[in-house]
């Protein structure tokens, strides 16, 4: 018997539609207590997966709202248990009253992520898919949403399951050799096993290599705006954000510390870092800000060098150029294109690959800048169409990769079956942690605590 849980599945702000969600063995009994169907039938006699119009009632039998009810019998539901939803008008007052009625009818308030946790425990999805649910909810870009949907659809899970099943079959053969010493691995079998391990290693290497991109996609690309004072870095930051975040004045040294904000530019999530202008002199506070600018430049994945196109290059510009030349990705934004040009853009183009003219004041060239940023971070190839996006997944994949590489090496040089088997078991343990086949209870609790109530 599973305890029946209930929760508000939609937000707490007024909206057109609000949803109350139930799961557990007592769903029909709870519905009969709070829902009066227009057709007069009890919940158990309503057609599954069909919307039924009726009244939502409070504990005293008073009508709260005119609602739609839909029931999903087990096992064909999100959680694998009997489930139902009540679709109300999206007033927080209505939803709270409906939830109170369900709790009075014997339901328990669902905990954070408890619906998805039940789906995982009942085998409706693995741990990778469960984590993708919260990734999809939190998605800030189309790429993040696409990756989450791919994971929810099982793209990454299928790859992990294929590797896991191949290693399980191979481990079974080695168990037979260990248990029955007279048995041996034939040459043909050995080559097949080496092929299995080679494929597993290649797939895991691709997954692990994709984590750096997945992490950037999820957290945002660290992007430093660097240049001399009054080049227009803060104005460019504000233009990219679409609102005034940084203070802009004609006085050099206005920005004295790094200012960080997220923005989606060219479909890429950026962590924009506005920095103090690079120059010598200034007071102690400004000098500290300049030092932080240099540190930010070293850590950034993308550097946007901002130059003042209305002035010739200076020693401060050259210093800023030297700081960003080693950046993994670099774009030179020649700002103030709305003013008479004094900077030799042709000479810059000979030195740097991506040189663009922009005007933070008028918005000219910002679309080209967005396109240039998107070109720096194209959607890369992934195993099965999904990227690892969190440290837990990457750690498990790394441990699996290391164990598979050890097993392959041991088998290739003719080590005994028990040695190869030990490495295979280590790989299986790590892969089981990745998809949830062999995961600790405390880790499961930690993962689902990240979810919102009602999901």
Regions found by a protein language model. Name each.
Residues 1-146, 150, 154, 328-331:
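A glycine-rich (often HGG/GG-containing) alpha/beta subdomain
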Residues 2-12, 142-264, 281-283, 312-455:
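C-terminal-of-GTPase-core extension/linker across diverse P-loop GTPases
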Residues 53-65, 69-73, 253-281, 299-302:
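Switch I (G2) and immediately adjacent beta-strands of P-loop GTPase domains
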Residues 89, 307-310, 336-337:
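Structural motif
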Residues 108, 269-271, 354:
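Conserved beta-strand segments of alpha/beta enzyme cores
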Residues 241, 276-277, 301, 308, ...:
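Short glycine-/small-residue-rich Rossmann-like dinucleotide-binding loops
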Residues 272, 306, 333:
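Generic enzyme active-site microenvironment
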Residues 286-310:
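Inter-motif core of Ras-like GTPase G domains
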């Amino acid at each position: 018997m599973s305890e029946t849980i209930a929760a508000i599945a939609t937000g707490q702000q007024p909206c057109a539609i609000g949803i109350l969600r139930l799961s557990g063995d007592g769903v029909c009994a709870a519905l009969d207590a709070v829902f009066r169907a227009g057709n007069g039938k009890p919940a158990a006699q309503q057609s599954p997966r069909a919307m039924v119009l009726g009244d939502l009632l409070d504990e005293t039998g008073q009508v709260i709202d005119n609602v739609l009810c839909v029931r999903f019998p087990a096992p064909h539901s999100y959680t694998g248990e009997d489930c139902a939803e009540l679709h109300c008008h999206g007033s927080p007052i209505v939803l709270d009253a409906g939830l109170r009625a369900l709790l009075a009818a014997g339901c328990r308030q669902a905990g954070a992520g408890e619906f998805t946790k039940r789906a995982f425990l009942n085998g409706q999805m693995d741990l990778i898919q469960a984590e993708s649910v919260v990734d999809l909810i939190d998605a800030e870009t189309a790429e993040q949403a696409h990756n989450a949907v791919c994971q929810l659809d099982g793209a990454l899970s299928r790859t992990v399951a294929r590797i896991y099943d191949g290693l399980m079959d191979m481990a079974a053969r080695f168990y037979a050799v260990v248990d029955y010493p007279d048995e041996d691995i034939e040459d043909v079998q050995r080559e097949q096993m080496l092929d299995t391990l080679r494929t597993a290693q290649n797939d895991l290497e691709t997954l692990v290599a994709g984590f750096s991109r997945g992490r950037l996609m999820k957290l945002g690309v660290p992007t430093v705006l660097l240049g001399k004072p009054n080049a227009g870095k803060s104005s460019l930051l504000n233009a990219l954000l679409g609102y005034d975040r940084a203070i802009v004045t004609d006085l050099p040294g206005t920005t004295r510390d790094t200012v960080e904000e997220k923005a989606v530019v060219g479909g890429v999530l950026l962590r924009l870092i506005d920095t103090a202008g690079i120059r010598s002199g200034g007071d102690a506070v400004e000098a500290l800000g300049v030092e932080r600018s240099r540190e930010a430049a070293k850590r950034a994945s993308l550097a946007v060098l901002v130059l003042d196109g209305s002035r010739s290059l200076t020693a401060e510009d050259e210093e800023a150029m030297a700081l960003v030349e080693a950046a993994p990705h670099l774009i030179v934004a020649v700002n103030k294109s709305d003013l008479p040009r004094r900077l030799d853009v042709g000479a810059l183009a000979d030195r740097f690959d991506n040189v663009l003219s922009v005007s933070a004041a008028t918005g000219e060239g910002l679309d080209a800048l967005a396109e240039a940023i998107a070109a720096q971070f194209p959607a890369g190839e992934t195993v099965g169409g999904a990227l690892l996006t969190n440290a837990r997944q990457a750690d498990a994949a790394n441990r699996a990769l290391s164990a598979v590489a050890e097993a392959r090496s041991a088998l290739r040089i003719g080590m005994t079956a028990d040695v190869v088997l030990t490495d295979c078991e280590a790989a299986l343990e790590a892969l089981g942690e990745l998809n949830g086949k062999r995961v600790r209870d405390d880790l499961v609790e930690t993962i689902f605590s990240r979810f919102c109530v009602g999901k």
